[in-house]
Amino acid sequence: LHRIVPYGVPANYLTVVSIIIMWTAFTYFVTIEEVNSEAVLVAIFAILLYVIFDHFDGLQAKASQTSSPLGEILDHYSDVFNGAIVVYLCFRCMHLQLGWLFLIVLWFNFLAFAVTYVEQRERRELYFGKIGSLEGVILILLVMLSCLSFAGLDVWHQPGLFSQPNYLLLFTVFLLGFLFTAYGC
């Protein structure tokens, strides 16, 4: 599928396009008060495009042999900011407050990115666990798909384990994933 990208297109252009897509979705969500099913679809579509372009930029850099230190930094930093936007969009689509839980998940997300960046820069190796960031994004997309209906959204707010809302279990799984990533480095 990545072969549809013309060979002469620099990989950094693809990274910039993914940044523009995610920041456009973020700006849209900041300006709306109520998140409806159309807004959830916007978030899902933006994240899907981000994942595709993020994958394609690496393939394009290898295919065209245009990989550069600037491109690597641009890619890493776009992943950090876009990852934070993914967390924000997930919280908004789930109709959750941007309070303490949001800040904790965001902090652990940044921690996982920082640890993997240091690992790559200092030790010249990169650890990929059995469940990585792509699987986490796929899980977020599945959660967002469930938020398209009121019944699906309601599932996350229903009491579950220890009479706590089910979304707490979901974000506990995410936090454990971030910790395993950091520990694996």
Each language-model region and where it sits:
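Topogenic membrane-insertion module of multi-pass membrane proteins
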Residues: L1-H55, G177-C185
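A feature for the membrane-embedded catalytic helix bundles of lipid/isoprenoid biosynthetic enzymes
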Residues: L1-V5, S78-C185
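Membrane-helix interfacial "entry" motifs
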Residues: Y7-A11, V35, S68, E72, ...
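Hydrophobic alpha-helical segments of membrane proteins, primarily the transmembrane helices
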Residues: V9-I19, L41-L48, T66-H76, L103-W107, ...
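Structural signal for hydrophobic/aromatic residues that build the beta-strand cores
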Residues: P10, G58-A61, G132
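Active-site-proximal flexible loops/turns
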Residues: V17, A25, F29, A61-S64, ...
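Short, flexible/disordered secondary-structure transition segments
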Residues: T31-V35, Q60-A63, Y88, L153-W156
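Acidic (Asp/Glu-rich) catalytic motifs at the cytosolic membrane interface
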Residues: A39-F91, V115-E122, Y183
